[in-house]
């Protein structure tokens, strides 16, 4: 995105949730770095660290530390590391979610209490916990961004409790936007269309969902991590200085559609 060169010069922030070079979070990290931002990345566990380290090197990013959002001490440690390195930060990207994939099939009615609580803790509460710590080290006028999905608004196959969690996450965006607005800190979410990522591998019949979106979205295609990254760049930069509490859709317009397109072919379920 050459026209964005220099847009984030002098801005510093952390991206939490990069898993590999197909992650939506990675698309965001690249867009920010190309626009001049200084980036920090986190990881969870040694396996992910091995994947994230070469990506950090590619962008010249700071490795801010291991972060398991179920352990608040690790979130504290990450923000302490950021404060020690930079003093203040300007943006945070939260790209963290989890649910037992075995409970994403079948009926939502059968969701276990344990998985419901764990899904909400990791996918929803962690955003509030991260925002609370960001508030302490963020410059006035900063920006916080999280990732959601259309399953928060409408029932989607094989999404179950994650849809409930994303709905709660979107509500959290609005409440946090009010809490932080007096400092000029903006809080928003991107609702991306389906993209082949590590997280998406846990969703059943995902190839079918991709094709359905491709055939029925107004733009007649799915979206890329680069397109999500460019939208994130807008929301994290001063270009969106008047925008907060929003869910910004990057889904080729699929969220506007009420029924199958009349010219869309009939497709059977494509097994992953």
Swiss-Prot record:
This is Enoyl-[acyl-carrier-protein] reductase [NADH] 1. It catalyses: a 2,3-saturated acyl-[ACP] + NAD(+) = a (2E)-enoyl-[ACP] + NADH + H(+). GO terms for molecular function: enoyl-[acyl-carrier-protein] reductase (NADH) activity. Its EC number is 1.3.1.9. NAD(+) binds at residues 17, 23-24, 44, 68-69, 96, 166, 195-199. Belongs to the short-chain dehydrogenases/reductases (SDR) family. FabI subfamily. One of its GO terms (cellular component) is plasma membrane. GO terms for biological process: fatty acid biosynthetic process. It comes from Rhizobium meliloti (strain 1021) (Ensifer meliloti). Disulfide bonds: none annotated. Keywords: Cell inner membrane, Cell membrane, Fatty acid biosynthesis, Fatty acid metabolism, Lipid biosynthesis, Lipid metabolism, Membrane, NAD, Oxidoreductase. The active site is at 149 (proton acceptor), 159 (proton acceptor).
């Amino acid at each position: 995105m050459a026209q964005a060169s220099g847009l984030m010069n002098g801005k510093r922030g952390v991206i939490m949730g990069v898993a590999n070079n197909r992650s939506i979070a990675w698309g965001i990290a690249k867009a920010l770095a190309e626009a001049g931002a200084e980036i920090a990345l986190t990881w969870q566990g040694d396996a992910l660290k091995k994947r994230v380290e070469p990506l950090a090197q590619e962008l010249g990013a700071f490795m801010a530390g291991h972060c398991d959002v179920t352990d608040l001490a690790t979130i504290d440690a990450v923000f302490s590391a950021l404060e020690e390195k930079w003093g203040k930060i300007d943006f945070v990207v939260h790209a963290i979610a989890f649910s037992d994939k075995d409970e994403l099939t079948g009926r939502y009615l059968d969701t276990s209490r344990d998985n419901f609580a764990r899904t909400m803790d990791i996918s929803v509460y962690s955003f509030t916990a991260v925002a609370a710590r960001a508030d302490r080290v963020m410059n006035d006028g900063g920006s916080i961004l999280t990732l959601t999905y259309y399953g928060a608004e409408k029932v989607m196959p094989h999404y179950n409790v994650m849809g409930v969690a994303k709905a709660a996450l979107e509500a959290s965006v609005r409440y946090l936007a009010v809490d932080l607005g007096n400092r000029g800190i903006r809080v928003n979410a991107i609702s991306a269309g389906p993209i082949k990522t590590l997280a998406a591998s846990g969703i059943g019949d995902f190839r079918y969902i991709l094709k359905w979106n491709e055939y029925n979205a107004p733009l007649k295609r799915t979206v890329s991590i680069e397109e999500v990254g460019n939208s994130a760049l807008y929301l994290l930069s001063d270009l969106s200085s008047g925008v907060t509490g929003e869910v910004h859709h990057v889904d080729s317009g699929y969220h506007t559609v009420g029924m199958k397109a009349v010219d869309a072919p009939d497709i059977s379920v494509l097994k992953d």
